[in-house]
Regions:
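A charged alpha-helical hairpin associated with nucleic-acid processing machineries
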Residues: 1-169
Length: 169
């Protein structure tokens, strides 16, 4: 009361860290949503993206399902995102999937697009590796080898040893 503003600092309430975890999760989900948008907005990039990203890299169940269906369509040469909407019967899921397909990526130059796409690929791989590490059985040597390969690939991408060969023309 009378002490406030008298030069005595007010006690600071410690932060719980809950919001930071949620923000991190939101960032990973945004990366997955952006990747789906890239894949449907620029189908000509699909082959290059598929070298680094697979449906297993989508850790949010809804996005994993959508990615799996998109990859199947791509493999048959019939990429049609609108057809996927019929698969989802829940209104909320339909809205979320439609939002992914109708999103815009507000980047001006090809250089900005390439950097953004590389950032999304790296972020998704990081999340995927963390997710798979957390659920890996201690005796799964083959899974461990795949994780190590994924980590090496991610390090190479970040270091510029591997390149996304993409063009937005």
């Amino acid at each position: 009361l009378a002490v406030r503003g008298a030069g005595i600092p007010e006690p600071v309430k410690p932060k719980s860290g809950l919001n930071r975890t949620r923000e991190k999760q939101d960032g990973f989900e945004m990366s997955q949503r952006l990747m789906l948008t890239w894949m449907t907005s620029y189908p000509e990039l699909f082959g290059e993206i598929a070298k680094y990203i697979s449906p297993e890299d989508f850790t949010k169940p809804l996005y994993h399902t959508v990615a799996k269906m998109l990859f199947e369509q791509y493999e048959t040469g019939q990429l049609n995102p609108a057809r996927l909407l019929n698969y989802f019967t829940d209104n909320e899921e339909q809205k979320e999937v439609a939002a992914v397909f109708n999103a815009t990526i507000p980047l001006e130059t090809d250089e900005e697009r390439k950097k953004a796409l590389l950032d999304v690929v790296c972020r998704m791989k990081e999340d995927s590796i963390a997710h798979r590490t957390a659920s890996l059985e201690p005796t799964d040597m083959q899974g461990l080898m795949k994780l190590m390969q994924s980590k090496k690939e991610l390090e190479d991408l970040k270091a510029g040893k591997l390149h996304l060969h993409i063009s937005f023309k």
